[in-house]
Amino acid sequence: MSTKNRTRRTTTRNIRFPNQMIEQINIALDQKGSGNFSAWVIEACRRRLTSEKRAYTSIKSDEE
């Protein structure tokens, strides 16, 4: 990985989004009054990770 895309605490990743999804995200950002796309994506990822962690923890405790 190129060091120019990495800081001490963050890493730049390039991903592709469907055009329609980008349009929907932009509308949501406009309605919220915040135009920070990166912050929106990071929050969505955090929510997903939290949700999956809860699901994983629940499955693991059911197995015990």
From Swiss-Prot:
Database matches in Pfam families: DUF3950
InterPro entries: DUF3950 (IPR025030)
Superkingdom of origin organism: Bacteria
Alphabetized NCBIfam families for the sequence: YlcI_YnfO_N (NF041551)
Protein name: Uncharacterized protein YlcI
Organism: Escherichia coli O157:H7
Gene: ylcI
